[in-house]
Amino acid sequence: MRLAIYPGTFDPLTLGHLDIVEQAAGIFDQVLVAVARSAAKVPLLDVDHRVAAATAAVAHLDNVTCAPFDGLLVDLVRERGACAVVRGVRGHGDFEIEQQMALTNRRLAGSLTTCLLIPAPEHLGIASKLVREIVAHGGDVSFLVPPAVLPFLPRQ
């Protein structure tokens, strides 16, 4: 079985994230959406709600599961026996960041494949930060997140 891990804070999971998950689900036998408990960010949703929202959004994908994680990604990869890490890339800026992370993870893990996937053009401009900003001002984000995620978002 080929397991890939798609890590992120997913605060909240967007249509762009879902696009990447769906692509990965078509490539790998199993995909784990690993929801990070990020101490560096102040989240819109706590980790349990982010996992629940992600789980609801990927319910149509039989080979995808969601779970929280702490610590180094390479430790989770070893623990789960994953063959690859999946990341989404929207543009040049994302590529440079992801390249640096992939090389660092490879050094930490000895060898680790990172699969960079590009979302559909209509999802390129979507970012969780944008969603959080709109939610904070009481705006409509239904065109940015999967319908299953909407009930988890705070109402302003």
Question: What is the meaning of each model-derived region?
Answer:
Residues 1-156:
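Nucleotidyltransferase catalytic core that binds NTPs
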